[in-house]
């Protein structure tokens, strides 16, 4: 019997008198086939260390521990720590850390792996309410995670992996794809969770690029420009950029010059620009003194 078997999950929760907290976005997966598929998608083996976020009662952790060298699981809810100690007692390669991963000193934590030189993958069923902050925190950290295989709301997975000229494409697509390739591996129905969430989920597989997708002179400015370009999706690039940088004649002249230098039409919408276009645009805007 597996932790994820519905009867086992139910028994564990009853034995420990556990009640779900909405504020932590807790939804426990009760489908062993999907858990195996996650591990297979992540290609976990004994030459890989894994960081898991939000292990819950250990359903995914159990599968990870059987396949990985070590698993470091960050759990914010202290009530789940004794439950995890119970459910994972047969696995000595799991370290449960009762800490908010957004506040954790990850640089120090990853040195606590017995073999810290092994590749590190992030495999997790992320809380929906905080998926994007956690992802960006991990991606932008100086830790060279080789891969992320994470469960999230399907809508967010679609946005992250979206291509230009689609409804889902936006600043989040650019922020992630700048650093990583992103592909939806498979969908997960809401019916396989306890309690069932109000949305469907998907597994997103992201692999770190050896170098960022494009070269830019100022990364922070590049992300600022891409965000500003999607301020109002139905507005033109020109309207969004003047809303962000200002509407004085001086600013408009600089914008005109930058768009001309970048060979981008002011009447276009942000969703029509590729990440390479945004790189060219942000460098031209920076050059123009904006």
Swiss-Prot record:
InterPro entries: KsgA/Erm (IPR001737), rRNA_Ade_diMease-like_C (IPR023165), rRNA_Ade_Mease_Trfase_CS (IPR020596), rRNA_Ade_methylase_Trfase_N (IPR020598), rRNA_adenine_dimethylase (IPR011530), SAM-dependent_MTases_sf (IPR029063)
EC primary class: transferase
Stored SMART domains: rADc (SM00650)
One GO MF term: 16S rRNA (adenine(1518)-N(6)/adenine(1519)-N(6))-dimethyltransferase activity
Gene3D superfamilies in alphabetical order: Ribosomal RNA adenine dimethylase-like, domain 2, Vaccinia Virus protein VP39
PROSITE patterns attached to this UniProt entry: RRNA_A_DIMETH, SAM_RNA_A_N6_MT
Compartment list: Cytoplasm
EC number assigned by the record: 2.1.1.182
Residues annotated for S-adenosyl-L-methionine binding in this entry: 27, 29, 54, 75, 100, 125
Keywords: Cytoplasm, Methyltransferase, RNA-binding, rRNA processing, S-adenosyl-L-methionine, Transferase
GO (cellular component) term, any one: cytosol
Main location: cytoplasm
Keyword Methyltransferase among record annotations: yes
Keyword ATP-binding among record annotations: no
Top-level taxon in the UniProt lineage: Bacteria
Catalytic activity: adenosine(1518)/adenosine(1519) in 16S rRNA + 4 S-adenosyl-L-methionine = N(6)-dimethyladenosine(1518)/N(6)-dimethyladenosine(1519) in 16S rRNA + 4 S-adenosyl-L-homocysteine + 4 H(+)
Pfam families: RrnaAD
Family of this protein: Belongs to the class I-like SAM-binding methyltransferase superfamily. rRNA adenine N(6)-methyltransferase family. RsmA subfamily.
Function of the protein: Specifically dimethylates two adjacent adenosines (A1518 and A1519) in the loop of a conserved hairpin near the 3'-end of 16S rRNA in the 30S particle. May play a critical role in biogenesis of 30S subunits.
HAMAP family: 16SrRNA_methyltr_A
Protein name: Ribosomal RNA small subunit methyltransferase A
């Amino acid at each position: 019997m597996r932790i994820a078997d519905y009867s086992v999950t139910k028994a564990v929760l009853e034995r420990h008198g556990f009640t779900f907290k909405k504020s932590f976005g807790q939804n426990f997966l009760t489908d062993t086939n999907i858990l195996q598929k996650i591990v297979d998608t992540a290609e976990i083996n004994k030459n890989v260390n894994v960081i898991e976020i939000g292990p819950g009662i250990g359903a995914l952790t159990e599968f990870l521990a059987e396949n990985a060298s070590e698993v470091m699981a960050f759990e914010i809810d202290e009530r789940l720590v004794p439950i995890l100690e119970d459910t994972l007692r047969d696995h000595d390669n799991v370290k449960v850390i009762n800490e908010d991963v957004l506040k954790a000193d990850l640089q120090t934590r990853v040195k606590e792996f017995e073999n810290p030189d092994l590749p590190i993958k992030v495999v997790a069923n992320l809380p929906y309410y905080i998926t994007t902050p956690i992802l960006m925190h991990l991606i932008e950290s100086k830790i060279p995670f080789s891969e992320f295989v994470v469960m999230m709301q399907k809508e967010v997975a679609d946005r992250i992996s979206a291509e230009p000229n689609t409804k889902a494409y936006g600043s989040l697509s650019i922020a992630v794809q700048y650093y990583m390739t992103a592909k939806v591996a498979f969908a997960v129905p809401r019916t396989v969770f306890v309690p069932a969430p109000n949305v469907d989920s998907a597994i997103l597989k992201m692999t770190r690029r050896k170098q960022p997708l494009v070269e830019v002179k100022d990364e922070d400015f590049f992300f600022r420009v891409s965000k500003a370009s999607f301020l109002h999706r139905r507005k033109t690039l020109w309207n969004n950029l003047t809303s962000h940088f200002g509407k004085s004649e001086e600013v408009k002249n600089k914008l005109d010059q930058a768009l001309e230098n970048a060979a981008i039409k002011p009447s276009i919408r942000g969703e029509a620009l590729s990440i390479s276009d945004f790189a060219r645009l942000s460098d031209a805007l920076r050059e123009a003194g904006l």
